[in-house]
Curated annotation (Swiss-Prot):
Region of interest (Disordered), ranges: 216-235
Protein name in the entry: Small ribosomal subunit protein uS3
A Pfam family recorded for this sequence: Ribosomal_S3_C
An MF annotation (GO) of this entry: structural constituent of ribosome
HAMAP family the UniProt entry points to: Ribosomal_uS3_B
SMART domains, sorted: KH
Residues in KH type-2 domain copies: 39-107
Gene Ontology CC terms: cytosolic small ribosomal subunit
Species of provenance: Aggregatibacter actinomycetemcomitans (Actinobacillus actinomycetemcomitans)
Keyword match Acetylation: no
UniProt cross-references to InterPro entries, sorted A to Z: KH_dom, KH_dom-like_a/b, KH_dom_type_2, KH_sf_prok-type, Ribosomal_S3_C_sf, Ribosomal_uS3_bac-typ, Ribosomal_uS3_C, Ribosomal_uS3_CS
Keywords associated with the record: Ribonucleoprotein, Ribosomal protein, RNA-binding, rRNA-binding
Family, per entry: Belongs to the universal ribosomal protein uS3 family.
Amino acid sequence: MGQKVHPHGIRLGIVKPWSSTWFANTQDFADNLEGDFKVRQFLNKELANASVSRITIERPAKSIRVTIHTARPGIVIGKKGEDVEKLRNAVAKIAGVPAQINIAEVKKPELDAKLVADSIASQLERRVMFRRAMKKAVQNAMRLGAKGIKVEVSGRLGGAEIARSEWYREGRVPLHTLRADIDYNTAEAHTTYGVIGVKVWIFKGEILGGMAALAQPEQQPTDKPKKVPRGKGRK
């Protein structure tokens, strides 16, 4: 039976960047890795209601720089930056080095696989019909410019005695095309009948040029003024 490789893992270094970017000596590598894991675990727990998409970590010169990608930056920052200052102190204590926290806003949460999966899971926990939740997520993603999306839910759907899986797809989701920009993530819905798993694949288009193309900032197209033809009248 064929199995699916993780869409991010197979594309690392091709069209997907690493979530942690640092170099370390052999004796420091394990400590840094454990620190990254604990920092992410802490932030995901503290910011459970802040619509956090992903957390990227860099370690420049005996310090740690954490970038939180969220659809609701106001909740993370707090009143006059009080909440983000508390997070910075907590992260510095966990990592054991000075910490810097940056907040990056997710402009289109409907095109982010993590946020879509979390949204479907929260709807399932509120007893929304799973087909309605799946279809709504697919329609919103396609409306905002996704080239394709696939959503799968697994478990005791609708309180059924026997667990099963159902999926819904629109557009194309080329999992074998390595230059395809595919966002993938999962979530869990804890219902009275048990846990329902949610998986989301979103195809945003193909990236030509690999990681070099990702590093370059996007250039906004400049609208050139249209030339108005002059009539041939008497001078």
